[in-house]
Amino acid sequence: MLRFTNCSCKTFVKSSYKLNIRRMNSSFRTETDAFGEIHVPADKYWGAQTQRSFQNFKIGGARERMPLPLVHAFGVLKKSAAIVNESLGGLDPKISKAIQQAADEVASGKLDDHFPLVVFQTGSGTQSNMNANEVISNRAIEILGGKIGSKQVHPNNHCNQSQSSNDTFPTVMHIAASLQIQNELIPELTNLKNALEAKSKEFDHIVKIGRTHLQDATPLTLGQEFSGYVQQVENGIQRVAHSLKTLSFLAQGGTAVGTGLNTKPGFDVKIAEQISKETGLKFQTAPNKFEALAAHDAIVECSGALNTLACSLFKIAQDIRYLGSGPRCGYHELMLPENEPGSSIMPGKVNPTQNEALTQVCVQVMGNNAAITFAGSQGQFELNVFKPVMIANLLNSIRLITDAAYSFRVHCVEGIKANEPRIHELLTKSLMLVTALNPKIGYDAASKVAKNAHKKGITLKESALELGVLTEKEFDEWVVPEHMLGPK
């Protein structure tokens, strides 16, 4: 039994309570909103609404926090809004400058630790919009020498002026996705394409057997095979780049339902121009704000482009993986870089790990696309309320493909070597070289040559001579793999 000595239980509890209150007062401050007072960590810039969301939506923990590119996009948006509101006479220049400075810090990532909210919150993203408003508000107050929480710079009246969560969140969705695609994804895909193109040129002289249906087919060069991969990546780049066009249309200025209530005429055009200036990308106001709030077809389209790209990258990684299979009992036409041990039980085994990592990324992107597609269909009346999960999955896809493209290029593609002896061995064994005889002896006779060779385990030449369909000289003149690489 717990016993208290030299003091009563009541006195002990009372003194402990006072101690805890003193500790709480030193590490927390009190913020207020329409629901009343709430304690907020003293070292954080966020306010009451962020704190309530933080307490009410403990789903997934830190790993499900709102993506930082979106947070940084909020900084761009809030700075742009302050500039435009000031220019239209709606915001005091002194307050505007403080908001701009604070928003710059958000955009640069300096205040990342002050954005704790997770993706799984209200479907409009209201709480993350208020997180940005509150952080910028309190940081601006601090810049002006005021007391944090005093609302000298108000999160709603000033930081959210001429705005609604319903138009700010879709706007930062587009800004974040566009910046990540333009500055991260496309450059890395271009690097991968260039690496594959270099291999295509390096391997252009190597004639190998083609395969269709996983069966032997007619010859091509290894360079031609790789040229197909180059084109797939180039097509993927073009598809993703095309999605930037629809992402360039911004919902900002639509406010609550698309009517533009509480904005001044021209606000929507001016803020798109200012965001363009801040980011270096071309943005424009959406021609129809009702569509921009209620539907996110541009996000679905962009995800679709990424999904197609994932299909392409899966095929490329899988082909290279198969062509590198072996080393003694597989195709082994390619020799892949050996980066790390491959087995905990089989000594000396090395696996195509980069290919496997890339294909797993592709599967994840396909899954993300499924989530985005369903969420994109869920715009009821004037608002889609699946915004956070849509942008979280889209940014995840962009990040994964960007990183995987780099890893696959550096640790696999650039180090691929052709196993020319093995390639030549398989080429000369192929029965499908018989296709060169079609124009000379006809399809039926050529088919008999191939089947006879396969049945008896002899070469095509031996089979053709045995069947008497041509002479040795004719065979040597007509069946030349190097002459079977294009129209003739």
UniProtKB/Swiss-Prot annotation:
Pathway stated in the Swiss-Prot or TrEMBL entry: Carbohydrate metabolism; tricarboxylic acid cycle; (S)-malate from fumarate: step 1/1
Residues carrying the site annotation Important for catalytic activity: E356
BP GO terms, sorted: DNA damage response; double-strand break repair; fumarate metabolic process; malate metabolic process; tricarboxylic acid cycle
InterPro entries per the UniProt record, alphabetical: Fum_hydII, Fumarase/histidase_N, Fumarase_C_C, Fumarate_lyase_CS, Fumarate_lyase_fam, Fumarate_lyase_N, L-Aspartase-like
Active-site residue numbers: H213, S343
Enzyme class at the top of the EC tree: lyase
Gene3D superfamilies xref list: Fumarase/aspartase (C-terminal domain) (1.10.40.30), Fumarase/aspartase (Central domain) (1.20.200.10), Fumarase/aspartase (N-terminal domain) (1.10.275.10)
Keyword DNA repair attributed: yes
Pfam families xref list: FumaraseC_C, Lyase_1
Disruption phenotype: Cells accumulate extracellular fumarate.
UniProt-annotated location(s): Mitochondrion matrix; Cytoplasm; Nucleus
Modified residue annotations for Phosphothreonine: T428
Annotated consequence of substituting H154R: Abolished fumarate hydratase activity and ability to participate in DNA repair
Signal sequence bounds: none
Miscellaneous notes: Present with 6920 molecules/cell in log phase SD medium. There are 2 substrate-binding sites: the catalytic A site, and the non-catalytic B site that may play a role in the transfer of substrate or product between the active site and the solvent. Alternatively, the B site may bind allosteric effectors.
Subunit structure: Homotetramer.
Role noted for this protein: Catalyzes the reversible stereospecific interconversion of fumarate to L-malate. In mitochondrion, catalyzes the hydration of fumarate to L-malate in the tricarboxylic acid (TCA) cycle to facilitate a transition step in the production of energy in the form of NADH. In cytoplasm and nucleus, involved in DNA repair in response to DNA damage: following DNA double-strand breaks (DSBs), translocates from the cytosol to the nucleus and promotes DNA repair by catalyzing the dehydration of L-malate to fumarate.
The name this protein goes by in its record: Fumarate hydratase, mitochondrial
Organism: Saccharomyces cerevisiae (strain ATCC 204508 / S288c) (Baker's yeast)
Lineage, opening ranks: Eukaryota, Fungi, Dikarya, Ascomycota, Saccharomycotina
